[in-house]
Amino acid sequence: MEKTEESVGIRVYTATPPQKPSPSPPSRSPKPVLISSLPSLPSGAAAGGGRGRKRRMVAQGVQKTVSKTSMLVNFLPTGTLLMFEMVLPSIYRDGDCNGINTLMIHLLLLLCAMSCFFFHFTDSFKASDGKIYYGFVTPRGLAVFMKPPPPEFGGGDVIAEAEIPVTDDRYKLTVNDFVHAVMSVLVFMAIAFSDRRVTGCLFPGKEKEMDQVMESFPIMVGIVCSALFLVFPTTRYGVGCMTG
């Protein structure tokens, strides 16, 4: 007889019977919520949200304007652009472009353009007393704004004793002065019309067309003005310029 090998195993018995899994409760579908049952926002909050979006759009427009025209600021008198950026928000307010606001924007643009034009016909010199005197350049020389008191009043002849006399050729009116004045006005208009607050009031309904034009116009103005300023150099240190 042949021997057969039997497998040996160990079986473990437990005293507690296995627990049956409890049936899961049937899933309930969420009840639909009617839109009419939701609480409605007050009209003031909705209006405030609209004003907030409008202010954000204005802020983005200002930031875009500054980024595109930052290279042109050096061609302007320092106080002109500062005055424009300070007065424009008070005129524009919340974007209400009525007839009065549009007229005030026209007057602001005219005033800033005139300052850019006339400030390029000013120059300055440092007198022997250490003070800096400003004046308009004329075909005869520099017409000083505020002359010192005469000698009989204890002032002394400061202009005659200045290091550079006002009748010098450098203080006489030249073609370069007109070129720089016209280019300065052109630069300011490029910066002003790059602002959506200006184009939105002056050209209502044509914001897209103006945006397309002003995408490249400031760059072209910067290139042309840079070339002309190299061809027609100037040594003026007038109002709004840093004195040497």
Swiss-Prot record:
**Where found in the cell?**
Endoplasmic reticulum membrane; Vacuole membrane
Provide the family line: Belongs to the plant DMP1 protein family.
* Summary of the tissues where the protein is detected: Restricted to flowers and pollen.
**The keyword Protein biosynthesis is annotated on this UniProt entry:** no
Question: This protein is called what?
Answer: Protein DMP9
- One cellular component (GO) term of this entry: endoplasmic reticulum
Its record classes its membrane topology as:
Multi-pass membrane protein
Q: Which gene encodes it?
A: DMP9
Q: Which domain of life is it from?
A: Eukaryota
Q: Where are the transmembrane segments?
A: 71-91, 99-119, 173-193, 213-233
**Keyword terms:** Endoplasmic reticulum, Membrane, Transmembrane, Transmembrane helix, Vacuole
Q: Which GO terms describe its biological process?
A: double fertilization forming a zygote and endosperm; endomembrane system organization; pollen sperm cell differentiation
